[in-house]
Amino acid sequence: VDIDDISMLQVGRWPWPRPVLAALINRIAEGHPEALAIDILFAEVSARPNDDQLLRTALQNAARQGTRIILAVGKEEGTNNYLPLYPLDVIAAGNTLGHITFHTGRDGLVRGLYMEEGHLPAMSWALVDRTAQSNRNETLNMLLERRWDVHDSMLLGALKELPPTISAAALLRGDVSPDQLKGRKVLLGSTAIGSGDFFVSPLEDAQPRRISGLELHAVAAEAQIIHHFKQPLSAPLQGSIEVLVVLLTMLLLYRTSPFLG
């Protein structure tokens, strides 16, 4: 479910007030999806405290109808380490938490993610696998030791096309029935300009292009569902390949040198 540019034009600019997001979540819940992962940070208190309670009520309503809720945990640079940006307790209570971090390679492209960062499962993993859980106490202990642990690097295989998308505005207006979401694993976020993170990635149709964080989470979830991922090279093998490339380049330059007879 995409809060796209059209949704922004019709409903209002970003960030949307939490009562509007609550109405959207209620609308999604009418379709009884199996799980709903929300790629939106709720780390700050709303200007109107009752708005946070409205959002909590919408999440509780969805959970009562059998939908698993996964909320985003962001990350910011600390003095000596990373600091997780948790949702407000009033919003996070009772819900699964997942990290939303992607890392760029040396060439500036995103090709995968860590399945676990800071004792938090990747949001896409938590969406696909109900056994993926966060451990806030372990995260706190890690931060006290000034560490940010990452585990299980996963390289994603490119998809021919992205998973299907529904415009948030169309869902709110009633142009699209929430029944389309029945039993599905749903991601809610935004691809609108100025609303979130954007990356360059070859994960759609194997061609590097600008892609939103929401779309990357969708690719990661789909790749896990269909087991379409690659095994990353081990550090020693990666280093050996880089050395070999350097040696071959030096050999080529030597053989083509004009100073050789």
Stretch-by-stretch model annotation:
Residues 133-176:
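Substrate-access "cap/lid" subdomains that shape
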Residues 2-145, 181-261:
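Non-transmembrane functional regions of envelope-associated proteins
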